């Protein structure tokens, strides 16, 4: 909360710093009390029982404290010394229900200032890593000037053991692995309605929460540090995308770089999910993209293509809108997001050609029609 100091590793941002004095006056104290007054007078939402059940699971994992009453929280932090974020549920693809802290509604996001914005690896990192391995082999083992040979000739001199693959790992409950600073614990509190107690309860979360703006930047510092150590100490060609680690390596290395990256993470206090481990191989689904490296040595090619399931999803959504003749701004936003991600894996991002009309519909005025216009029809037909 308040001003987040820069780590010096991400892109700098111009910022109007929120001072501790401003935070105490405008967010904590009487303002916090007013906000809590508003929460405790709210009726329970339709998801109250589900939220309470999910909270019990989080408590059992040791990620948070036990539910406390308002009086108990006041006794611990003092009146006006804490401020909660109401919880709601976001249902993800596949039906998974995730607890989200409403840090926007709680005012937490507004009262946060940051000096930097994060960056993450692009999927093309894998091709760059494979090219680096080929380039280093060329420098070390082929005659001087071999880098200027025609591609076919250069490829004919590459050994089989230079075959490359990629392995993937994912952190377990990643945000919860990043502890909250003790000074900020009073604002890293979530609120939910207990159907058993028939009253609002408040819980201190010991790790980062989904929904708080600063959580994303704060969390990403850890995998970036881990990646830097794995690269410099173990020469592991790994890259992080939030809580995902993707490691390029020679297949004959039998996953040693991937294993070393996991070892570094463990030494730093992190944990990977064994059920999400994907061993190093020439074909891999990475960040939702099908990556193929088996043609690298024969044709000098690394392929990136959208998963078949993603393509079918885009086609089905576009077809449904065309058949109904309507498209809401929310539906346009969802289709645009999915199609834009897939388009990033096409040559020249050609798939983006049909997305302008979806963007126009996404941001249209509230009083405008949801009917499919001629421009939107053309865009949907392109995607279908």
Positions of PLM-derived features:
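Nucleic-acid-interacting cores, centered on viral/eukaryotic replication and modification enzymes
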Residues: 1-384
């Amino acid at each position: 909360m308040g001003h987040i100091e820069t780590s010096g590793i991400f892109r700098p941002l111009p910022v109007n710093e929120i001072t501790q004095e401003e935070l105490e006056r405008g967010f904590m104290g009487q303002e916090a009390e007013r906000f809590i007054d508003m929460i405790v007078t709210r009726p329970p939402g339709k998801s109250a029982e589900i939220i309470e059940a999910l909270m019990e699971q989080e408590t059992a994992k040791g990620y948070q404290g036990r539910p406390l009453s308002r009086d108990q929280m006041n006794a611990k932090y003092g009146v006006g010394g804490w401020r909660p974020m109401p919880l709601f549920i976001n249902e993800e693809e596949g039906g998974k229900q995730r607890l989200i802290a409403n840090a926007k509604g709680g005012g937490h996001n507004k009262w946060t200032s940051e000096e930097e914005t994060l960056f993450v690896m692009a999927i093309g990192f894998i091709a760059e890593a494979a090219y680096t391995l080929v380039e280093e082999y060329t420098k070390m083992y082929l005659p001087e000037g071999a880098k200027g040979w025609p591609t076919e000739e250069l490829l004919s001199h590459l050994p089989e053991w230079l075959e490359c693959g990629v392995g993937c790992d994912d952190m377990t409950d990643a945000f919860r692995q990043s502890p909250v600073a003790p000074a900020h614990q009073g604002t890293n509190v979530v609120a939910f309605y207990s159907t058993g107690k028939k009253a609002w309860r408040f819980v201190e979360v010991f790790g980062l929460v989904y929904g708080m703006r600063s959580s994303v930047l704060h969390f990403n510092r850890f995998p970036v540090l881990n990646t830097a150590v794995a690269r410099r100490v173990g020469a592991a060609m790994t890259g992080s995308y939030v809580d995902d680690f993707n490691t390029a390596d020679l297949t004959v290395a039998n996953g040693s770089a991937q294993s070393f990256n996991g070892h570094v993470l463990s030494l730093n206090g992190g944990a990977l999910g064994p059920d999400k481990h994907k061993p190093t191989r020439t074909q891999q689904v990475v960040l939702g993209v099908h990556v193929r490296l088996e043609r690298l040595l024969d044709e000098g090619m690394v392929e990136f293509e959208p998963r078949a399931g993603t393509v079918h999803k885009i086609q089905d959504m576009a077809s449904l809108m065309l058949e109904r003749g309507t498209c809401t701004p929310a539906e346009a936003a969802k289709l645009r997001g999915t199609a834009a991600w897939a388009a990033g894996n096409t040559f020249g991002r050609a798939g983006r050609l049909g997305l302008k009309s979806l963007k126009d519909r996404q941001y249209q005025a509230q009083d405008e029609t949801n009917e499919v216009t001629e421009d939107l029809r053309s865009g949907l037909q392109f995607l279908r």
